Design a protein with these regions (language model features):
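Non-globular, low-confidence helical/coil segments that flank catalytic cores
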Residues: 2-13, 18-22, 27-327
Length: 327
């Protein structure tokens, strides 16, 4: 277990910005879907304007107050991503949902936490290892908000997800850099990406989220690659974080030295499958992290990784019981 005690002021924060948002209304006739996918032409998408650290701290021995606790669970979903967050205001957030084989596992994990509502669902990008289990999740819970990048693909997994969204009469909010999802009482969630609505590959359409609670900051990179990292740094966004969820499962296409130095994290979490076919994480990325003295926590080695923090304390632990859980 890793424990930290905060005894210094918060990292420098960005000035608050206000951005308009858009609601994406999907008008789909599923019976006419072809091999070209749900959105064979851009005219089939309708956008409607809407009102819509430095760390010198000693280890903590004090128990975190559950009523004011932020809990982040990096679920062990093999070669995929899924992060379940219980916010200190009682709301919940899910970032991605792994492959389809893990859908029921994710549903049970959320139910075991005592929640029946997901206030924020973030689908970073439409790759199967991020959206495969999402249909099962959407069917199992009350959903309030869904954020997705404005890109599409013709895969069956993506079409199944859109059909579930349609059948549940849910509305997608197109994600873009600068959106502030919430900001209250030292709690803030802001999107740093996507910036490009027509990326060369879907990884670079990924939603990147920065979550802050008091002086603790967390960065969730989806599968964003170095191209996106450069865009974010060019915009002079505040990327500093105590913990970064490494982009693209530790692929060498992500996690440039310049970006890691700007983030300056204590811990890097890598969501990755054991003995995966892609040889993730890349030895080059592991070397970069080690040379920058960033602790590495991997789901293939530890299982589900759980972070809890309040105003002054942060703890990291893992759930070995699910390390080799068959989904």
């Amino acid at each position: 277990m890793l424990k930290k005690n905060r005894n210094k002021t918060s990292r420098k924060k960005e000035k608050s910005k206000t951005f308009g948002s858009f609601l994406l209304v999907i008008l789909l006739l599923f019976s006419s879907c072809t091999n070209h996918g749900i959105f064979p032409d851009e005219t089939e998408r309708i956008f409607v304007s809407s009102v819509v650290t430095q760390h010198t701290a000693a280890p903590s021995t004090e128990k975190i107050d559950e009523k004011q606790t932020l809990t982040i669970s990096y679920l062990n979903v093999g070669q995929g991503d899924c992060i379940f967050i219980c916010l200190p205001n009682g709301e919940t957030m899910l970032i991605d949902a792994g492959t389809a084989s893990y859908g029921n596992h994710i549903v049970q994990y959320i139910k075991d936490s005592g929640n029946d509502t997901l206030n924020y669902v973030i689908i970073t990008h439409p790759h199967a290892d991020h959206i495969g289990g999402m249909s099962a999740v959407l069917k199992a819970f009350q959903i309030e908000q869904i954020y997705m990048p404005s890109v599409s693909t013709n895969t069956k997994t993506y079409q199944t997800l859109l059909q579930t969204i349609y059948e549940k009469n849910l509305t997608i909010q197109p994600a873009h850099a600068g959106m502030v999802l919430f900001e209250e009482k030292n709690l803030r969630g802001e999107l740093l990406a996507p910036m490009d609505t027509n990326p060369h590959n879907l990884n670079n359409a990924s939603i990147v989220l920065r979550l802050s609670y008091y002086s603790y900051d967390f960065l969730f990179m989806g599968d964003a690659e170095q191209e996106v990292e450069t865009q974010i740094l060019t915009e002079d966004a505040n990327v500093s974080a105590d913990i970064i969820k490494i982009g693209h499962h530790g692929s060498d296409t992500s996690s440039s030295v310049s970006f890691l130095k700007a983030v300056d994290p204590d811990v890097a979490v890598i969501s990755v499958g054991e003995d995966n076919a892609y040889d993730h994480p890349s030895p080059n990325v592991l070397t970069r992290l080690q040379e920058l003295q960033i602790d590495i926590w991997r789901t293939d080695e530890k299982g589900t990784i759980v972070v809890t923090c309040d105003k002054d304390h942060m703890e990291m632990d893992w759930e070995m019981s699910d390390k080799n859980l068959a989904a």
